[in-house]
A protein has these predicted regions:
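Bacterial N-terminal signal peptides
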Residues: 7-15
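Boundary at the C-terminal end of the N-terminal hydrophobic targeting segment
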Residues: 18-20
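Conserved beta-strand hairpin/beta-sheet module of binuclear metal-dependent hydrolase folds
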Residues: 27-90, 185-201
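Active-site metal-binding loops of divalent metal-dependent hydrolases
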Residues: 29-31, 77-79, 106, 133-134, ...
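Residue-level marker for buried hydrophobic side chains located in beta-strands
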Residues: 73-75, 102, 128, 195-197, ...
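Active-site metal-binding motif and surrounding structural segment of the metallo-beta-lactamase
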Residues: 82-129
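Metallo-beta-lactamase
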Residues: 89, 97, 124-175, 180-256, ...
Length: 266
């Protein structure tokens, strides 16, 4: 019975909405994960034990539906067998209603939900936006068959962009490469309101906020990933911009201030 309840709790589909003037953000919960501390890079045994005494960490896979300047945008698509389509339906949006998907990068837990159980486009009317460097890395260099198959379902509807581009009204792409070669974050602006959608700039806030130099084994370039994290977090602290992170504890929002060599929430 206890095992059943645990599975049930991990399978709950929940969402949360927040408004910041002209930006309405809905957090879409896809999956929970509990990796062990062996995936941390740059943290010694004492640090791991201090923040995770039982050796286990708690993580989320999230996506975000954002309404800005009259447009609804889905940021990332979750896992291939996840709950993003269900979450959207709970919020009054059918998969066919999604017209715009912006991807922070092409790891499975961010692009996988682009396809349904039959391998077809889960969002049949959507255009998919991905950075040029990210697409080149996974499609041209790595020739990842799963990425290729997913993007093929959106043939003619995959748009590439460069960091610094205004991808659409109120949305600018920022270079946060390191986790992957083409990883981007997005700076959203509507009037005086701002939001940063940061993808995998952080995975485990319990340790990576006080110790931002800690990376994860999934970072293609750990040193560059750390630099990107510090640069964007410093910017967010200075400008007091909230951040939406795909692996931040639900509902995935961070408001940070500097704390010594690291950061803390306020």
């Amino acid at each position: 019975m206890k095992k059943f309840l645990a599975v049930l709790l991990l399978s709950l589909v929940v969402s949360s909405s927040a408004w910041a003037g002209g930006i309405e953000t809905t957090t879409l919960f896809d999956r929970k994960s509990n990796p062990d501390t062996s995936i941390l890079v740059g943290a010694d045994a004492e640090q791991k034990a201090r923040y995770f005494p039982d050796g286990k960490m708690s993580g989320n896979v999230l996506a975000f539906l954002v309404k800005i300047k009259g447009r609804e945008i889905l940021f990332d698509a979750g896992l291939p067998d996840g709950h993003i389509a269900e979450e959207l339906k709970k919020n009054g949006l059918a998969a066919g209603d999604v017209k715009t998907i912006l991807l922070t990068h092409l790891h499975r837990d961010h692009y996988g939900g682009l396809v349904d159980a039959d391998g077809k486009a889960a969002f049949p009317n959507a255009e998919v936006y991905v950075s040029r460097a990210e697409r080149a890395y996974w499609v041209d260099e790595k020739k990842d068959p799963n990425v290729i198959r997913a993007l093929e379902q959106y043939a003619g509807r995959v748009q590439v962009f460069e960091p610094g581009d205004k991808v659409m009204p109120g949305v600018k792409a920022l270079d946060t490469s390191g986790h992957t070669p083409g990883h981007v974050s997005f700076l959203l602006k509507s009037g005086k309101d701002k939001l940063l959608v940061i993808g995998d700039l952080i995975h485990f806030s319990r340790i990576q906020l006080p110790l931002p130099e800690v990376a994860v084994k999934y970072d293609v370039d750990p040193a560059k990933a750390v630099q990107a994290r510090k640069r964007i977090f410093d910017f967010a602290c200075e400008k007091r911009i909230p951040m939406a992170g795909m692996h931040v504890p639900f509902p995935g929002m961070l408001n940070l201030k500097k704390a010594g060599a690291g950061y803390e929430e306020y």
